[in-house]
């Protein structure tokens, strides 16, 4: 019988320790760091290995300022060193759950790619935070993706204005206890 491999401490530590950073230093991302973040997203698993995503990287300050208008809580995009828009085939048009573009599969896969990028950034000393897109027409106009594509989330990245933000303790309340959220075999 095969014994499960223990989770390496650095992986679990990163999962448990990553924090949202909304206040960024006025400093561009090192191109190698940006490439590693993008590679982390590229290496995410996906349903049927379709990799149904395109990443649009924005580094221009003017563009980032305009992107900050795509949602009521997207203001952090204006101060980011870079943003990565996560673009997929429009999941609202993918209604057949047996098809290659099943809406839940597309969004699940996108979440996997996003989390890989967030964890890679954290490991590099780079903060991040997601922005939900509410103004879809504005996002399409600014980013230029075709009508059959959709952007629901944009990730902000930057070196934190306060490096302690990457390692600060969780806010009071933290995570729910495992016993509150896990059921075995049945509810």
What is each PLM-predicted segment?
Residues 2-14, 20-21, 153-187:
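C-terminal helix-cap and adjacent tail motif
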Residues 14-18, 46-49:
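Short, flexible turn/loop "capping" segments at secondary-structure junctions
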Residues 20-36:
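A short N-terminal beta-strand-loop micro-motif at the entrance of redox/enzyme domains
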Residues 33-39, 43-110:
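Glycine/small-residue-rich phosphate/adenosyl-binding loop
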Residues 41, 84, 99-142:
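Small-aliphatic-rich amphipathic alpha-helix that forms the alpha element of a beta-alpha
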Residues 54, 134, 153:
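Residue-level "edge-of-site" marker
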Residues 75-85, 144-167:
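A glycine-rich helix N-cap at a beta->alpha junction
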Residues 88, 133, 159:
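Short secondary-structure boundary segments
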């Amino acid at each position: 019988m095969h014994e499960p491999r223990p989770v390496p401490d650095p992986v679990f530590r990163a999962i448990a320790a990553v924090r949202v950073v909304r206040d960024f230093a006025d400093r561009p991302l090192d191109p190698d760091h940006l490439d590693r973040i993008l590679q982390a997203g590229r290496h995410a698993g996906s349903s049927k290995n379709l990799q149904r995503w395109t990443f649009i990287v924005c580094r221009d300050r003017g563009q980032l300022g305009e992107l900050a208008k795509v949602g009521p809580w997207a203001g952090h995009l204006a101060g980011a060193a870079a943003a990565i828009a996560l673009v997929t085939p429009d999941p609202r048009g993918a209604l057949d759950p047996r098809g290659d573009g099943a809406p839940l599969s597309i969004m699940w896969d996108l979440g996997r790619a996003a989390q890989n990028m967030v964890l890679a950034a954290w490991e590099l000393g780079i903060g991040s935070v997601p922005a939900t897109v509410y103004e879809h027409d504005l996002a399409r106009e600014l980013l230029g993706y075709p009508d059959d594509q959709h952007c629901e989330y944009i990730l902000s990245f930057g070196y934190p204005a306060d490096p302690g933000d990457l390692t600060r303790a969780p806010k009071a309340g933290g995570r729910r206890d495992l016993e509150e959220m896990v059921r075995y075999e049945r509810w």
